[in-house]
A protein has these predicted regions:
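N-terminal beta1-alpha1 ligand-phosphate binding loop
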Residues: 1-24
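Short glycine-rich anion-binding loops that position phosphate/pyrophosphate groups of nucleotides
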Residues: 3-4, 70-73, 101-104
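Short, surface-exposed alpha-helical segments at coil->helix boundaries
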Residues: 10-18, 50-54, 107-110
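Conserved strand-to-helix beginnings and helix N-cap segments that scaffold or border functional pockets
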Residues: 10-13, 77-81, 110, 130
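Catalytic-core regions built around general acid/base machinery
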Residues: 16-19, 83-90, 112
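S-adenosyl-L-methionine/SAH cofactor-binding core of RNA-modifying enzymes
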Residues: 25-95
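Structured adenosyl-cofactor binding patch, chiefly the S-adenosyl-L-methionine
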Residues: 103, 107-156
């Protein structure tokens, strides 16, 4: 929910989007589409969240739903990659990643989600979260592909 304005954040997200596109094709996954939904204009927070949830669920359809919310789990990059691999192997190649608006997410989204991911308890701007999601998707795909981008577990001491 929300739009990413032009600038360095949009450029960073676009760079990762292009990388993800190439990896998706190589791994037999659906490509990456970015859908920006406007924030609801409802007066009450609960009404805004409910309207936004309805629009997001309609867009997600039958896709795997990954919701990014502070109430979620904080999986390792390897665990996130394994979930994506499992979904692909189950024939579920479409993954919808949802980042909420400034009012947060309606509980219906978390209930419907196949995975709720948290980047921690910190509050972050939407554009930063979008860049983190794009990078983690790329990282997960490189882990699945055995690409050297991800170098976890190395001790430089």
């Amino acid at each position: 929910v929300g739009r990413l304005k032009s600038g360095p954040e949009r450029e960073l997200v676009e760079r990762y989007r292009q990388r993800v596109e190439g990896m998706c094709r190589a791994l037999g996954l659906a490509g990456l589409d970015t859908v920006e939904l406007p924030e609801s204009r409802a007066r009450r927070d609960d009404d805004r969240r409910a309207e936004e949830a309805a629009a997001l669920l309609e867009k997600a359809g039958a896709s795997v739903l990954v919701v990014f919310d502070e109430r979620g789990k904080s999986p390792s990059s390897e665990a996130f990659a394994e979930k994506i691999r499992q979904w692909r192997d189950e024939g579920r190649s479409g993954i919808a990643c949802v980042i909420g608006g400034p009012d947060g997410l309606d509980p219906k989204l978390r209930q419907r989600a196949d995975l709720v991911v948290s980047f921690g308890a910190l509050t972050m701007p939407h554009q930063i979260v979008r860049a983190l999601v794009a990078e983690q998707l790329y990282r997960a795909l490189t882990i699945i592909a055995g690409h050297p981008y991800h170098r976890a577990g190395h001790d430089d001491s």
